[in-house]
């Protein structure tokens, strides 16, 4: 899923 590519910086789990 390509969403994880840019979803990491807007998601709290990416912190």
From Swiss-Prot:
Where on the tree of life does the source sit, at the highest rank? Bacteria
- On whether Lyase is a keyword of this UniProt record, the answer is no
GO BP, sorted A to Z = defense response to bacterium
Q: Which UniProt keywords apply?
A: Antibiotic, Antimicrobial, Secreted
Major localization class: secreted
User: Which subcellular locations apply to this protein?
Assistant: Secreted
Q: GO CC annotation: what is one?
A: extracellular region
Question: How is this protein named in the record?
Answer: Antibacterial peptide fermentin SNR1
Species of origin: Limosilactobacillus fermentum
